[in-house]
Amino acid sequence: MTGFMKGAMILTVAGLLVKVIGAISKVIVARILGGEGVGLYQMAYSLYQLIISIGAAGLPVAISIMIARKVGQEDFRGARHIFKVALTTMGIIGVLLSIGFYLAIPYVIEVGLITDSRAEGALLAVAPAIGIVSLLACFRGYFQGFQNMLPTGISQVCEQLGRVLVMVGAAIYFLPQGIELASSRAALSSVIGVGLGLVVLLYYYGRESKLEGQVYSLESPSKIIQELIVLALPVALANIMIPLIGAIDLWLVPQQLMLSGYGKEEATTAFGYLTGMATSLISLPVIVTMSLATSLVPAISRLHRERDQEEIHHRMRTALRMTNIVTIPAFVGLCVLATPISQMMFNTPNAGGAIAVLSASIWLLGVQQVTTGALQGLGHTAIPMFTLLLGAILKILLNLYLTPQWGIEGAAWATNVDFGIAAIANVYILYRSTSFQVSFIEIGKILFSSLAM
């Protein structure tokens, strides 16, 4: 098994474990704190996730690209120099972000961005985690640059496990003292979780044998920081685009449903079928494709540095083949069995239509993720941001037209077009830049086999 596939497998297993642990914790915490307590916790946690997605989301990709290039030259000293500069820079930025977040909390509540002032304690609790996440991202990017996904995978599981155990324990222990205190102490779990993840990565870093390799002159810190920004910023912007479009949908889709004759409660219910039920089902298979994309970035980056076009094509073909093998049967199966699955999992058959339509996004999003990984590995980190933006603009326009015509299924079709346009644009740009061609015969065979089952 190649290092690329081994890395993807490790990240897939870790991703599934994180999902399972997270799903179990949601049920337990909801039973302990109830809707009110969970709401206070989520107000803080959602804002925290938005901040770290802006501040640190692009770092692992950017650092892994820069490290992989040095590893391809056997310049291990240069790779460690890049890591140390990135770690120092992000350590300082992380501390400043944490302090800024802490000081901004009263104003965030005052202007109404957080509508319940009782969430202040939970917001204060998550502030230190922002600084730690910046360091965590640097370490993960470093190991990914060496195509060593084990530290990243184990740290993700430990982070989630630590967060969940502290969250549940704090919720149980502090609930008798009031829902506000219980939710704020449960929010401390974010700090404990990322802290535990960082300890795991420090352990692996300490164990690592420091290879010397070839000796090259070291780049200046300013040049490293400049390249880091150029690579990381588009990735961070692309990462926040999907939740941003989700926020637009939150306002736009129910409004369009009501314009077509839905009552307020009916529109909210239909929106729940799409975002709370259908979306949750498509998120599981794409764990595999996200892992493939993450593992693909440093592999392609290293090969691109070595100008090994044939091996680049081989890695991309392998990644897309695995994507098709996993996502096409999942898409077909979910589409055909949408209504029974809706009844079994959500105790209503009414989400079946939205699930059936949105199931196509399993394949489309999978292709978009893997081709994004390939483009990032080639150094084109800005392109996936623009292809996602193009898809998002079309999605908004189609929501305005299709949702009043076809109801919630129209909104699901708009989402399919969003991911589909981004995927097609990525594939086209890969063809133009590397002459890589997708095997439509292979896709047809997998689709036919899936339909025949």
Tell where the protein language model's regions lie, with residue ranges:
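N-terminal membrane topogenesis motif
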Residues: M1-I21, R77, H81, E219-I242, ...
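Interfacial/gating helices of multi-pass transporter permease domains
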Residues: V29-L50, I179, S183, K223-L231, ...
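Helix-loop junctions and terminal segments of transmembrane helices
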Residues: A57-G72, I282-E310, M316-L320
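Membrane-water interface segments that mark the loop-to-transmembrane alpha-helix transition
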Residues: A62-P106, G121-A122, H313-T327
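Alpha-helical transmembrane segments of multi-pass membrane proteins
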Residues: I99, L103, I114-C138, V332, ...
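Membrane-interface junctions at transmembrane-helix termini in multi-pass inner-membrane proteins
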Residues: V133-S155, A360-L390, Y401
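Membrane-interface helix-loop junctions in multi-pass transport and translocation proteins
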Residues: M149-P151, L161-V199, A382, A392-I424
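Transmembrane alpha-helical segments of multi-pass transport proteins
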Residues: N239, L244, I441-M453
